[in-house]
Structures are given as C-alpha cells and as structure tokens.
A protein has these predicted regions:
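P-loop NTPase motor core
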Residues: 121-206
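The Walker A/P-loop phosphate-binding site
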Residues: 7-116, 131-136
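Short, Lys/Arg-enriched N-terminal segments with co-localized hydrophobic residues
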Residues: 1-6
C-alpha cells in the first residue's frame, strides 16, 4: 500500500524479492516497522518526552539515552523502569560500568534480584564481547531490558594500559569505540526486540 493507494506492481515485485530472500518485507507488514510494546518509567513527563505519550515510555526494540548531570535522577528513572519491566515479565541485564550497583537499591524497589543479571565491567572491548555473546543466547521474542550505567564510565584497554604505565595521554579511540558499541546495541535491540536504557552524564559525551 502506498498512502491510501494499493501496492504497485513494482512494490509487489520488490516485496516478494525481500520475503523470498528473508531480507525484509513491505513497511505495512514488516515486524521491524512496529513497536510492539512500551515499558513505562512510571513518570508521565518522562514517558511523554520519550514516546510522546504519558502512559507509554521506553519502546521495546529500541535504545534510549538518559543524559544529564550527576545526581539528576537518571538512575532512579532506570530503577522505576526496571520495576515495571519485571512486572511485565522482563529479565533485566544491568551493565554496571561504575561498579556502583548495590543489592540494597534493588531491594528498595522490591525487584526480583534473581532476575537481574549483574554485569560489572567498564572496558569497551569486554562489554562488546560479552554483549554479543549474550545476544547469541537470547531468542527473538525473549523479554529482555538492558541497562547500561553508565556510558560515561566506558574506557578502553588502552586507557588501562596507559594508566598502568604512568602515561598521561588522552585516549583518542574512546569516542569511536563508544559509537561502535552503541551501534551494536541498537542493532541487537532492533533484531531481537529488546529494550535498552543507556545512562550518560551528558548528551555530548558520546
């Protein structure tokens, strides 16, 4: 269908090609062209800013970023979303790059601790490898919400090596490595219909 018109012979031909080769489908029937579910942050104003609807929130199949200064409530928003996600049957994967997640904060929201997978790691190479290996264990349709806390703490193995060797140099590879990981997260969420919240200190810190 094109607008209110029926599909043209060409669009039908290309749709058939896409389906036959398992590349895709027309947008009307594409499973990747629709958001199947939203996870509420339990804050109407935040839901509205994310999804343009006060009752929706985090779109499943996409990743969102919560960016702002320290102590601005980013982690609290993520925790509220975790609680709602578990009520909806989601397993939580908590990527703890700040090594700051404590059992007590999850107990405070009455979360199911056994259904939160804690992944404490900060090196980008390690996160990338673990994320892609975990993605192989997840089936399409599995309910998974990834929380990355936080992007600002991501470092490279070079950063660690330089620190060990006492080198006071800026690692220029970090921005590119961060963007590479972000791309993998976005693609994996889209393909497997997972949700992801990436916490960041500032929007410019990418």
């Amino acid at each position: 269908i094109k607008g209110n018109k029926m599909a043209t012979p060409l669009s039908e031909k290309l749709t058939k090609f896409a389906k036959k080769n398992k590349f895709g489908d027309n947008m009307k029937d594409s499973k990747f062209g629709k958001i199947s579910e939203y996870i509420s942050t339990k804050a109407a104003i935040i839901n509205l800013s994310i999804s343009a609807n006060p009752t929706w929130g985090v779109p499943v199949g996409k990743s969102i970023m919560l960016a702002g200064p320290t102590s601005s409530g980013k982690t609290q928003i993520a925790l509220s979303t975790i609680k709602k996600a578990q009520e909806m049957g989601y397993t939580i994967v908590y990527w703890d790059s700040e090594f700051a997640a404590e059992e007590s904060i999850f107990k405070a929201i009455q979360a199911d601790l056994e259904d939160i997978i804690h992944m404490p790691m900060a090196e980008l190479e390690q996160i990338k490898t673990a994320f892609m290996q975990m993605d192989q264990e997840i089936e399409e349709g599995d309910k998974v919400l990834h929380i990355f806390d936080s992007m600002g703490a991501w470092i490279t193995s070079k950063t660690v090596e330089d620190a060990v060797n006492g080198k006071e140099v800026k690692d220029m590879s970090i921005p590119g490595s961060k963007k590479g990981l972000m791309t993998l997260i976005n693609q994996a969420c889209g393909k497997k219909h997972m949700g992801a919240i990436i916490i960041n200190h500032t929007y410019a810190n990418v």
